Amino acid sequence: RELKYIFITHLHPDHYLGLEVIKSYYPDARVIAYQKAADDINDAYDFKIDYWGNTVLKSNGANIKFSVEKWQQDEITLEGEQIKILGLLCGDCTDIAALWLEKSRTLIASDLVFADCHVWIADMRTPEILKNWFKTLDTLEALEPLRVIPGHSSAALTLHPCAISFTLQYINDFIRELKRSKDAAQLVATMDRLYPDYPIRICLEYSAKILKDRYVWPGDWPLSLRHLASGY
């Protein structure tokens, strides 16, 4: 099959630093993102390559930048089916573009939704920002999807819509224990008891360090996040 588009949902680097591999097989595919998300990604790209590609992963990291086109329309047509872009919503960062396939009632949620894994909460620096994620989850629930493709999940990916409620429960548990814990280590230990052996541990550890211990992370983007202290 011909691959026409590679749709990037938001600026977090795990969603586009692998483009080099995909483009090696599909060199003519257009890399697109919805409205402001395209600007966010293009602005972040050099920084993310330098931090993750050169500093963290080194020889295993990405080192090629691809231009991301700004997609202005509210839908994409794929093999005759209209895929609706649900606008820019708040999830584990602001301005994430989810996709909705009405015919099959399938939600491609990206990082608005996680399934049976630790959740990245580090960018939700204040309760006011976090409220927008809760509003997003309400919006997604109201769609009554039959299948939900989360941004991250355990290996046992089920596509079950309960991933939406899982995400809400995890966030509520994390924030409750954040307020109770004396430091990040205690918070991590408590969440480990609540969610034993859950994958993507980096999400838990960094969220705890940044929000509880107020760790200034050199990988933060936009840079303004480094100057936005935890409000919990």
Locations of regions flagged by a protein language model:
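Loop/turn elements at helix/coil->beta-strand transitions in domains of secreted/extracellular proteins
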Residues: E2-K4, P27-R30, E81-Q82, K103, ...
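Active-site HxH/HxHxD metal-binding segment of metal-dependent hydrolases
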Residues: E2-T77
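A mature extracytoplasmic/lumenal domain signature
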Residues: F7-H12, Q35-A37, Q82, L89, ...
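Stable alpha-helical elements in mature extracytoplasmic
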Residues: H15-G18, A37, I129, W133-T136, ...
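Extracellular/periplasmic catalytic domains that process cell-envelope and extracellular macromolecules
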Residues: S24-Y25, I76-E79, G91-D92, W100
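Accessory terminal helices/loops
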Residues: D40, Y51, A142-R147, A155-Y232
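Beta-strand-turn-beta hairpins that frame and shape the catalytic cleft
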Residues: E75-K84, L101-L107
